[in-house]
Amino acid sequence: MPESSRDKGNAAISGNRSVLSIASPTKLNILSSDWSRNQGKVSKNSLKRSSSLNIRNSKRPSLQASANSIYSRPKITIGAPPLIRRDSSFFKDEFDAKKDKATFSAYSSRSYPTIGSESVVSQTSLSQPTTSREVDEQFTVAADRYIPILQGASQNKVDPETLHEALPPPNASPISHLRAQTKIVFKQNVAEACGLDMNKRILQYMPEPPKCSSLRQKSYIMKKRTHYSYQQEQKIPDLIKLRKINTNPERILDAPGFQDDFYLNLLSWSKKNVLAIALDTALYLWNATTGDVSLLTDFENTTICSVTWSDDDCHISIGKEDGNTEIWDVETMSLIRTMRSGLGVRIGSLSWLDTLIATGSRSGEIQINDVRIKQHIVSTWAEHTGEVCGLSYKSDGLQLASGGNDNTVMIWDTRTSLPQFSKKTHTAAVKALSWCPYSPNILASGGGQTDKHIHFWNSITGARVGSINTGSQVSSLHWGQSHTSTNGGMMNKEIVATGGNPENAISVYNYETKFKVAEVVHAHEARICCSQLSPDGTTLATVGGDENLKFYKIFDPRCTGRSREDGLMDGMLGLIGKEGCRTNDKENRSKNSSEIHTRRPSSTSQYLIR
């Protein structure tokens, strides 16, 4: 195809497609996508008669049809031959010979124990064809007593750790996860009903030692108990309840020119409900409240590799392919500053912390930039050997999590600029990183195509506290919550993962049980590259290689789960004077809010230098 006609075709396609326009929910914008037009065609040729096809030894005269005529094969009128069963006489002689040969070789190679000088099994019995059951009976009768042989220690006790091995296979439906957990809870309930301890052996050959008094036992347990052993004491988990989520997207927007690259972060959603998306060399802003679309900038010759909103939601940082990072003011739609890394490679990941911005490059360096000073690079960390494709600051700013193409997760101490922990558990690139909002010390990381796992880390001890096998590539992770009416309206901690092949699904897991509670199968035609959670924490925006931006309602609105103890405390406070406590809380909140606002700059010119 000549280049001129190809350019005209591309121009025609781009002319018919408007950026971030509402696509039809029924057609899912299949015809307008280049990927679907090239990969989604299914061509089926009808069976035609060729000149080389001749029917011989037929009673009918030869067919002299043209090459373009459709040929239909005649049906076979002769009945199919009868099938030969395996137990028929045809296989009987051969089967008996093999059986006798195997029995003789097994008996000749087996040696039996003896008592004194007499053999337990006589040689005459070995010469006769006997079965294994007869041999076992002779051995039992000749021996003086029967001693059971324990094949393993785990055979005679119920180990809670082995119960997790009964998890369903990856990519299993939420119903399969519910059935697996039902079996686990059933085993635990049976053990409790029978009066058996989960770590107690069933067969015991010695009597139990005398028990001490209850007071002495409690004091001993309190002395030996530590924080970690106390955390490991788990109650019988309640059965998970499958959640019903809408598998159809609430809105579909067209995103022509989106880069199908797993290592890039091209989507960001601000707290002011403005979604920023990078389409090739241009950056667009979509207001989720009004639906307005605006073009912020178009670099024409430079590709955008990462996009992230600042903490004040008034500025946005753009990582480019040439190694530079630009900061734009959204209100004035103008460029504020350009920060040059000097590396000459693309900036694929960004993370803000007040006036500091961390940039991850393709060469493996992490640069900490201070936007208030002229020499913006204040620190450079070069511990990764591959591209840094994931960065995320902790809420308190004391730690920074990074994931790279070297299959490594690192947790950095921002005060010493040194990595506290370096984890190489993943077997693929780590892009998805997310800090837990309920337990700030818990970090979730997701691996790529060959890893397919989600690992949970304790950022204080560096220990891995849980894992989930998703069965697909993990491109993003987001924490959410749901509320159940069966458990008194308590909050369920959940995490949503977006993936790629084979199902391009959105999966929701319960953090406590690690079971899948909901999923959206085939959410996109291609793999999901990026996703962002809305400011209210309910809607998930996903974009994939099919050049479609979709919005799914996943979580319930964010609110703090109240327990029964909180209700009792509120009642007690009401007796001693609830109004006084409320006034004190309001004063403390006003002081904290004033301190927070005083720390942030009031205008752009105070901390941004051109």
From Swiss-Prot:
Residue segments, region Disordered: 38-59, 579-610
Basic and acidic residues biased stretches: 579-598
Polar residues bias (residue ranges): 599-610
A cellular component term, taken from the record's GO annotations: anaphase-promoting complex
Motif Bipartite nuclear localization signal: positions: 85-101
Motif residue range(s): KEN box: 586-592
Record field: compositional bias (Low complexity): 43-56
GO biological process: anaphase-promoting complex-dependent catabolic process; cell division; meiotic cell cycle; mitotic spindle assembly checkpoint signaling; positive regulation of anaphase-promoting complex-dependent catabolic process; positive regulation of mitotic metaphase/anaphase transition; positive regulation of protein ubiquitination; protein ubiquitination
Summary of subunit composition and partner proteins: Component of the mitotic checkpoint complex (MCC) which consists of MAD2, MAD3, BUB3 and CDC20, and of the MAD2-CDC20 subcomplex, both of which appear to be assembled during mitoisis independently of the kinetochore. In mitose-arrested cells, MAD2-CDC20 occurs in a larger amount than MCC. MCC associates with the with the APC/C complex. Interacts with MAD2, MAD3, BUB3, HSL1 and PDS1.
Domain notes: The KEN box is required for the association with the APC/C complex. The C-box is required for the association with the APC/C complex.
Protein name: APC/C activator protein CDC20
Species of the source: Saccharomyces cerevisiae (strain ATCC 204508 / S288c) (Baker's yeast)
